[in-house]
């Protein structure tokens, strides 16, 4: 396990946008993009899977709608912010514990029983959609060519929550 700790640290710091994008699919329970990262031994297959996940993610972003979400960073003083919602889900469509486990991906929509599912960075009253850029993707693919563990650790961090 010690050997993978530096990989996990590197991925958390350098590739956090990829983690957040994949976490979006975890919340949707779309593991077709997660499982190959864990089980594949072929970097090309992993790159193909990630490329497809990115294409679909771009499709989600292009059809997102803006909603007023509630941010509970300080439970005593919740804040509302406008945010792009990639998916709007009803309460019964989300497992009960997911909003607390994936609290930076699932947000309660203000004055509604629905949830906004989007990987966001929230600063004060501003919410920004997280999207991996081309240089991050290229760098990850380069790392993947030299160490297949990058894919497995990326998947583990995406499933892990927050």
Curated annotation (Swiss-Prot):
GO biological process, one term: defense response to virus
UniProt keyword terms in alphabetical order: Antiviral defense
Pfam families: Csa5_I-A
Effect of residue 35 to A: Altered protein oligomerization, protein has a smaller radius of gyration, elution from a sizing column is altered
InterPro entries cross-referenced by the UniProt entry: Csa5_I-A
Oligomer and partners: Oligomerizes as an infinite helical thread in crystal structure; disrupting a potential salt bridge between Asp-35 and Arg-55 leads to altered elution from a sizing column. By immunoprecipitation Csa5 interacts weakly with a Cas5/Cas7 complex. There are 3 csa5, 3 cas5 and 2 cas7 genes in this organism; the immunoprecipitation studies may not distinguish between them.
Position of the signal peptide: none
Gene3D superfamilies, per the entry: 2.30.30.1260
Upper lineage: Archaea, Thermoproteota, Thermoprotei, Sulfolobales, Sulfolobaceae
Record has Ligase as a keyword: no
Protein's UniProt keywords contain rRNA-binding: no
Summary of the function given for this chain in its UniProt record: CRISPR (clustered regularly interspaced short palindromic repeat) is an adaptive immune system that provides protection against mobile genetic elements (viruses, transposable elements and conjugative plasmids). CRISPR clusters contain spacers, sequences complementary to antecedent mobile elements, and target invading nucleic acids. CRISPR clusters are transcribed and processed into CRISPR RNA (crRNA).
Highest taxon in the source lineage: Archaea
Name of the protein in its database record: CRISPR type I-A cluster 1/Apern-associated protein Csa5-1
Organism for this UniProt entry: Saccharolobus solfataricus (strain ATCC 35092 / DSM 1617 / JCM 11322 / P2) (Sulfolobus solfataricus)
């Amino acid at each position: 396990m010690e050997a993978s700790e530096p990989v996990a640290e590197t991925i958390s710091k350098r590739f956090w946008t990829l983690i957040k994008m994949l976490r979006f699919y975890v919340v949707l329970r779309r593991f077709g993009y997660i499982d190959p990262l864990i089980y594949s031994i072929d970097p090309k297959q992993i790159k193909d899977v990630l490329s497809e996940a990115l294409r679909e993610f771009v499709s989600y972003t292009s059809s997102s709608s803006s909603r007023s979400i509630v941010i509970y960073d300080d439970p005593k003083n919740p804040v509302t912010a406008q945010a792009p919602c990639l998916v709007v889900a009803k309460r019964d469509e989300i497992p009960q514990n997911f909003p607390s486990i994936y609290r930076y991906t699932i947000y309660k929509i203000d004055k509604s029983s629905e949830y906004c599912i989007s990987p966001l960075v929230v600063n004060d009253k501003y919410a920004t959609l997280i999207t991996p850029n081309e240089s991050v993707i290229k760098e990850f693919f380069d790392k993947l060519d030299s160490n297949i563990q990058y894919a497995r650790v990326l998947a583990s961090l995406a499933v892990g929550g927050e």
